[in-house]
From Swiss-Prot:
Main location: cytoplasm
Family: Belongs to the SHE2 family.
Location within or outside the cell: Cytoplasm; Nucleus
Assembly with partners or alone: Homodimer and homotetramer.
GO terms for MF: RNA binding
Keyword field: Cytoplasm, mRNA transport, Nucleus, RNA-binding, Transport
Function: RNA-binding protein that binds specific mRNAs including the ASH1 mRNA, coding for a repressor of the HO endonuclease. Part of the mRNA localization machinery that restricts accumulation of certain proteins to the bud and in the daughter cell.
Protein name as annotated: SWI5-dependent HO expression protein 2
């Protein structure tokens, strides 16, 4: 086992701050898109309950986002703290966000979709399959990043796990999958770093990957909101 007890130097803390910004961008993309969808839902009286549920989700995402924006990793953890201490605290909050995002994605792609189609008889008022692909891909990348944050420092804690990751591993084990050959990002193994500089370098690379995911998701949401606007306006 490698010695991964590194001090939290300022460079690493600044990179963790970039990770916080990446999560904030992720949440903001949902907040912006859902606010527009909620506004359109006002035109359909039969969707009052669904609209109220989405408003509840948006409020939760806003709360998380405000908490993220108030975090200052350099100020909080410089001066003798270990990287593990900062990462465990941050990952714990990220996991809270991910659990809500998992429920929200399910609501958008299953419950809300089914209720909207049932009440309006219109399949165009829901999240499109093209957008769902981006929802799932982006979520899985943020899950994997959070797992990497921890396991790259050889942190294995039952309280710092994401349900979807545990489920994927359980299914893979039951199916006898070779994890070294899988293309599933959730099942790919994480290597332990040997230095703080290596951790920072990989952390920065991950932030670039998350940025690409966020931009793809944002474009998908923009296409959806444009489509929703045209459809809902046509129902006036």
């Amino acid at each position: 086992m490698k010695n991964v007890t590194f001090p939290a130097n300022e460079n690493v803390l600044k990179s963790l701050q970039l990770a916080i910004q990446s999560y904030s961008n992720y949440l903001s993309s949902y907040i912006d898109a859902l606010n527009k969808y909620i506004s359109h839902q006002r035109r359909v009286s039969t969707l009052r309950f669904e609209r109220a549920t989405l408003i509840k989700y948006v409020k939760k995402l806003r709360f998380f986002n405000e908490e993220l924006m108030s975090m200052d990793m350099v100020q909080q953890y410089r001066g003798g703290n270990l990287i593990k201490t900062a990462v465990c605290s941050l990952a714990s909050f990220f996991i809270r966000c991910l659990e809500v995002m998992d429920l929200l994605n399910y609501y958008l792609t299953q419950s809300l979709k089914n209720e909207t189609i049932s009440k309006t008889l219109n399949r165009d008022l829901v999240v499109s399959e093209d957008c769902v692909v981006f929802l799932e891909s982006t979520y899985r990348h943020y899950v994997k990043f959070t797992q990497w944050m921890l396991e790259a420092l050889d942190i294995h804690d039952a309280t710092l796990t994401v349900e979807v990751l545990q489920f994927a591993r359980k299914c893979a084990k039951e199916d006898g999958l070779d994890l070294e050959e899988t293309d599933d990002i959730l099942l790919q193994e994480v290597g332990v770093v040997s230095s703080a500089s290596e951790y920072q370098e990989l952390l920065d690379e991950w932030c670039l990957v998350l940025s690409e995911q966020y931009m793809g998701l944002t474009k998908a949401f923009e296409a959806e909101t444009t489509r929703w606007s045209e459809i809902f306006e046509g129902r006036k």
